[in-house]
Amino acid sequence: MMLLSSSYSGGQFPGVSPLGTRPKRSTTVVPRPVVTRATAGGVRNNLEVVGNAGTLQGMDIDELRVIVRKQLQGVELSPSSYDTAWVAMVPVQGSRQSPCFPQCVEWILQNQQEDGSWGHSAGPSGEVNKDILLSTLACVLALNIWNVGQDHIRRGLSFIGRNFSVAIDGQCAAPVGFNITFSGMLRLAIGMGLKFPVMETDIDSIFRLREVEFERDAGGTASARKAFMAYVSEGLGREQDWDHVMAYQRKNGSLFNSPSTTAASAIHSCNDRALDYLVSLTSKLGGPVPAIYPDKVYSQLCMVDTLEKMGISSDFACDIRDILDMTYSCWMQDEEEIMLDMATCAKAFRLLRMHGYDVSSEGMARFAERSSFDDSIHAYLNDTKPLLELYKSSQVHFLEEDFILENIGSWSAKLLKQQLSFNKISKSLMPEVEYALKYPFYATVEVLEHKGNIERFNVNGFQRLKSGYCGSGADKEILALAVNKFHYAQSVYQQELRYLESWVAEFRLDELKFARVIPLQSLLSAVVPLFPCELSDARIAWSQNAILTAVVDDLFDGGGSMEEMLNLVALFDKWDDHGEIGFCSSNVEIMFNAVYNTTKRIGAKAALVQKRCVIDHIAEQWQVMVRAMLTEAEWAAGKHIPATMGEYMSVAEPSFALGPIVPVSAYLLGEELPEEAVRSPEYGRLLGLASAVGRLLNDVMTYEKEMGTGKLNSVVLLQPLAAGGAASRGGGGAPAPAPASVEAARAEVRRAIQASWRDLHGLVFGSGGGSSSSIIPRPCREVFWHTGKVASVFYQEGDGYARKAMRSMANAVILEPLHLQE
């Protein structure tokens, strides 16, 4: 039986926070759900969301959603003082006497901080960082070039002097290429006659760091190094081969979509297309410019990904659909903004496929070989995020032989493991990488992922390219919504658990001493595929039928006599006329009455949704299941070994007991399922594939236990014949198979599991099931996909209910409060 046996995902390079500048808001408190907060003194309860989230006074849920929706629809780009300064340095063509973009100069004059700096702090404490020093130096240079803002220049130089030690501190996080860009601008400033109130030895230290950077043996190939040096060209100035750099120019005229690099090329090479890009950029955005442009697609996809990871994407379903429609259009037109960037392309591919868009893996072909990474800036910087995005995208394949995605998955996994082993992954990203490598995306518990992401979410997200930029203008609102939704969901789950416990007592299921009746784990099995709060009826029906199928399975698996098995099968066949049969034991009476009366209750609720009676279909599912279980019991008693895998699976699939669980719950999802839909070949295929995945996973993980009890499974069946001409049944006196034959059989079963996964994924999300021609509503198709995930989770290490880890997981999802960062 089936149940028995960070936050924002970045990675684009160059890239930008998907969420833009943070608007100023008040900092008092709204009523909060009780959560647990970690502090230096231990754990305490608090009604606030979380310390680092700040507070949101007087806002209800709808107001929070409005803010997030506004940000999602038009992601606000965070202004980059550094890039704005470089654009401000560009002169009018044919003249070096006046700026081409005076609005950028004016913005610099209007946005100096009181301490004399420009740029963003990397955290709530406002500490000085290398990005602030870099931005301040760039702004000082821009003002000095045009001989304006002398007081601004004086205050900026003073700020740099007071904090110069930060620039040479190797422990401080640095923007990409800092040792080149900062030292290059410092040399330019000194050449202009600017005086820095610092010791000569400190300035020499900066130039030594520059030489070290040039000599550094970084990751990747020579091509990766060339690309990196082109990206930080503004730090090289006249030393750069600008003809070589222009090889990286894109159709929009930019270099790497970087305003600073493009501005430097406009200064040094007078490239018309580069200037056109800057004109277009400044005309659209006014004064300041971002660290990367255009970036709308990537930024919006990151926000969609964040909302999904935090468990609140359903609140913004229409907005997400609009974004994905736009992304799909860009994909089909092969637009550079998506296709040239590793992280954007991978994230777009994954999200589009998982939302049912028909996108070919051919769009990922440019990343099929490891050289695509080794020759990139990502390799030079040992950048993990795009690598992780590629690995995730490689898992969403439908075809048995999709060599593009298989290749991407192979080399990206290898590199991620290498980065882990050499400790090259940041602490903030390491849990996500470890989790992705350990658990395939079809073996994850989304609601548990949501909880972990909420607990680790950083509302002060600060990303670094050549310059830093703030995270989302809606991070606090996202966290507040996620905390509220998770807390409410837990309260609903806990009510459902109490109801299940009372239902068990009502039908005397706890009196069945041979059976495992575990409401908590059964509810977890329902929460995994049906976690949205509003699906309570479907979840309760799933949980009840999970308990009931487990009880019936235990009867057929040694808990009852053959007389009781035959009696129960006859009762199910008669169904409403079961009084004609009678009960041969109290155990049979308890089981049948529990199934029959619970099904009547569920059927009444389903009839309201479906506008028809569905009891006959539900009864059929029970009848098919118990007949299959009886066949297995007869096989065991007679020591019968099926001649083929086909014969075995024809019984093993229905005996896995999804029939009375999944189709019944599907009736309660709010979607109409007409008779022709549930009788269609497509519906039968969905149920068959989900059952095959579960049964084969069970066989692989419980092989040794079942072999010891003489119970047949696919691993035993597929073993090459051992000495004596028969496969061992365990306990029957036949010789045990050689270890090699066992591993070969298990490998064959795993291949069958993978094939079933691919077919199921394609039927649910691909053109086979994702098209409008399907008569089965998408939410109903998806529940079969999530059913397979339940099996993967429950059988990661063995018999699902027997694992202590499963109870721990159930506690974490249903009972334990959030444990949030301070």
UniProtKB/Swiss-Prot annotation:
Annotated positions binding Mg(2+) 3: N698, T702, E706
InterPro entries per the UniProt record, alphabetical: Isoprenoid_synthase_dom_sf (IPR008949), Terpene_synth_N (IPR001906), Terpene_synth_N_sf (IPR036965), Terpene_synthase-like (IPR050148), Terpene_synthase_metal-bd (IPR005630), Terpenoid_cyclase/PrenylTrfase (IPR008930)
Induction: By chitin oligosaccharide elicitor and UV irradiation.
Record Pfam families: Terpene_synth, Terpene_synth_C
Record bears the keyword Metal-binding: yes
Free-text remark on how the cofactor is bound: Binds 3 Mg(2+) ions per subunit.
Key words, A-Z: Lyase, Magnesium, Metal-binding, Plant defense
Residues that, per the record, bind Mg(2+) 2: D553, D557
Biased segments, Polar residues type: 1-10
Residue window of motif DDXXD motif: 553-557
A GO biological process held by the record: diterpenoid biosynthetic process
Region Disordered, annotated ranges: 1-29
A GO MF term: stemar-13-ene synthase activity
Reactions mediated catalytically: 9alpha-copalyl diphosphate = stemar-13-ene + diphosphate
Cofactor annotation: Mg(2+)
Top-rank lineage group of the source organism: Eukaryota
SUPFAM superfamilies listed in its UniProt record: Terpenoid cyclases/Protein prenyltransferases (SSF48239), Terpenoid synthases (SSF48576)
Enzyme Commission identifier(s): 4.2.3.33
Residues given in the record as Mg(2+) 1 binding sites: D553, D557
Similarity field: Belongs to the terpene synthase family.
Annotated domain remarks: The Asp-Asp-Xaa-Xaa-Asp/Glu (DDXXD/E) motif is important for the catalytic activity, presumably through binding to Mg(2+).
PANTHER family: ENT-COPALYL DIPHOSPHATE SYNTHASE, CHLOROPLASTIC, ENT-SANDARACOPIMARA-8(14),15-DIENE SYNTHASE, CHLOROPLASTIC
Other facts: Stemar-13-ene is a putative precursor of the phytoalexin oryzalexin S. Phytoalexins are diterpenoid secondary metabolites involved in the defense mechanism of the plant and produced in response to attack (by a pathogen, elicitor or UV irradiation).
Record function comment: Catalyzes the conversion of syn-copalyl diphosphate to the phytoalexin precursor stemarene.
Protein name: Stemar-13-ene synthase
Organism (species): Oryza sativa subsp. japonica (Rice)
Gene from which the chain derives: KSL8
